[in-house]
Amino acid sequence: MSQFPPDVHALIDASVAEDQTFNDPTTQAVVPPEIQGTGWLRAKATGVLAGVDVAIAVFQRVDPNLNASAILQDGTPLCPGDNIAVVRGSAAGILRAERIALNFMQRMSGIASDTNRYVEAVRGLNARIVDTRKTVPGHRFLDKYSVRMGGGYNHRLNLADGILIKDNHIQANAFREMGLKDVIELALASASHTIKVEVE
């Protein structure tokens, strides 16, 4: 996932600004700018990796002179102690970026790992693990990517991706004395041939 859509770059920028990475009095006070270092991103638990490219992008956004590279790729099963990525360069730059990079990777790997547990639970059955739009605002692309890394499938990315009739749509038409069949007929009549109509 080295090519990100613009909203992911914007999310990284917002996270860097939120954490005030360029105004870190602790690092400025105790880590001279000339000190060079190496940071290893290591797994602390079993799971499935997701977000390593995002973590690398964070390091490079905070300090473009940092040399960060992935050792493992997204979708890889993890064991405690596995080296995931390495970053070399200014120790101050590494320290300023590490928490944001880890936050992204931990969240994404958590989603991938949880998804994979469900995928494994239904293996051999005629079932798929499919996600929803119930994502943290701004994180939808990354959340859905993480689901895929865990072996799950994406449903709708947004409202425009299909018709999904839910109980709220039926209740909204109750005053017109319309039932489920009527609402489905309305949806089918307005849907183009490329739009899937589903009922939850």
Which sequence ranges carry the predicted segments?
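Acidic/glycine-rich phosphate/pyrophosphate-binding loops and surrounding catalytic core
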Residues: 2-200
